[in-house]
Amino acid sequence: MLETVIAFLALLNCHPEDYVITPSNNTFYLAGDIGVIYVKPGMYKDHILVHEIWHHCQWQWAGKKPAQSYDEWRRREEEAMKVEDIFLNLSQ
């Protein structure tokens, strides 16, 4: 499952580094410089991982910083949705 997701994202030049996938945001402050990807147990599906790991790559590309404004957050979210849609269309 995760190998397929990582291979797809690599085609789009998204190479996630130093991350942990967790079902809870309780670990956020413990992570430090490591990206934390939150996926609820019932939501652990390929297309959701594509979306969330894409956000991790966006975070890496931005110098490990979250979106600095609502507009930036919205742009990142729209981009992640487009990447997820591409994955879903190719998976059919």
Give the location of each predicted region.
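Glycine-centered secondary-structure boundary/capping sites
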Residues: A10-C14, A62-G63, Q92
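Zn2+-dependent metallopeptidase catalytic core
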Residues: M1-E17
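Short non-domain terminal segments
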Residues: I6, N26-T27, D85
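Post-HEXXH active-site segment of zinc metalloproteases
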Residues: G32-I34, G42-M43, H47, W59-L90
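Histidine-centered divalent metal-coordination motifs
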Residues: H51, H55
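Short intrinsically disordered terminal tails
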Residues: M1, N89-Q92
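Active-site scaffold of zinc-dependent metalloenzymes
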Residues: C14-D46, H56-Q60
